[in-house]
Structures are given as C-alpha cells and as structure tokens.
Amino acid sequence: MTPIQGEWKIDAIGLPPQVLRKIYFDNAHRLLVRSLPAPEIKAVRIGRDIKLTGDLRAAAWDNAPVAHLDYALRDGAVHQSVATTVRVLWSDKYLYLGYEGPFSRLNVFRPAWLDKERAGLWDRDVVEAFIGTDPGNPLHYTEFEVAPTGEKLDLDIHLPGKSLEWQSGFQAATVVHQGRSTWTTEMRIPLSALSKDKPVVGTRWRLNLYRHDLDHHAFLAWSPTANDTAHTPEKFGYLIFGP
C-alpha cells in the first residue's frame, strides 16, 4: 500500500446527503457551539389576525421564515429524529408562533389541566419560547410553554427568580397527528404583555426556542446554550419584526 504523503482530503463523491451533513456541518456545529453567532429570525407581518386551529393550516404560515430546532441545548449534538420547526408571525396585537415536530411516543401529564396552570409542565414533552424585550435588563424575559395535550404555562422571569402567578393572556391550540406521528401547536401572545413599547418594523427582541422530547432524551434549542439550562439569556437569538 502506498503511504499517504503531503496534503490529502476525503472526497465526498457518492456519499448520501445525511452523511455529508454530519461530516461537514453537524460535527462542526458541535465543536463550535460555544462560539456560534446568535441566530436571527424575521417575523412576517399579517394584516389581520388568524384563527388558532393548532395545525398551521392558515395560509399566512406558508410565507413565514422557518427556525430549526435540530440541536441539543447542552452540547449542540444533532437530534434529527425529532427536528422541529418554528414559524413566526405578528399583527398589531399579537405575536404568533407555530411549531411542528415528529414524535415516537408522547410523554404528558394525565389528566390534562386545561383550566389552570401546572408548575413543572416542563418536566414532560413541551415546546417553549423565551422572549426578552428589554435590552437594558437581559435578566428579565418571559417564558411560554405548550404541551401536546393543550396544557399551557406562562412565566415572568427575573433571574434568578420566576413568577408563576403572572398571566399574559396568551392562547394556544394543539393538534396531535397520529397518522404521521407529528404534533403541531400555535401560540398567540399579546404584544402588550411582552412590552409597554409596541414593536414596529425593524424592532429587535431576544428570543430562544426549545422543545423537550423525553422519549428521545432530547432538549432541543434554536440557539444552544452550551450548558444545562435554557435560562441563559446571553445565548438567546434575535427576533426581528419584518414587514
């Protein structure tokens, strides 16, 4: 066998796309997770509010950019089997978030509490949004969670404390699509609950998006925090209010 000398490389000819992604992107992402730039997503403005159906069937969702939740919060490891997408819309009154992700088996509280909030909802399968609107106080932000059962929870965070008594008035609708093993949810959050200053086109808020999936031991993050907690506001990405 001829020894390898000088510069050399591995050609990617014939390798399937998922292998190429792992070699060239996922491994690099994991290695660089502590120094990656903050991601950005632009919310699309809608002229009229949409009805919450839970299944993202309103036409407005089709035009919204997509945030991808592919990576583990702690170390940036890829979890493609439960990769989740999030779309963002806004109107004069509300911020809308639409989540979609696959599942193998749902882990939820039974019976579901649909008329009151459950502290510890995050200990089962949920999707989450953490939203910071005050650049002068990054330790203050709000947290929103929705479970596949339709249970929901909102919290006002002032690190290191949190208020479960706070009520934002946010609404959510959820659909579990058993036939294709996915679940979807739509959140509608009053802008007035997020900031006293109404956003305009170009406004930038801090945002991170998460998903817990116990069956796959996955805690996914849009912007991985590179530690064991989602409550790391310096690692939040940016929500930009677009036209």
Where are these regions (language model features)?
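Mid-to-C-terminal alpha-helical segments outside catalytic/metal-binding sites
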Residues: 1-37
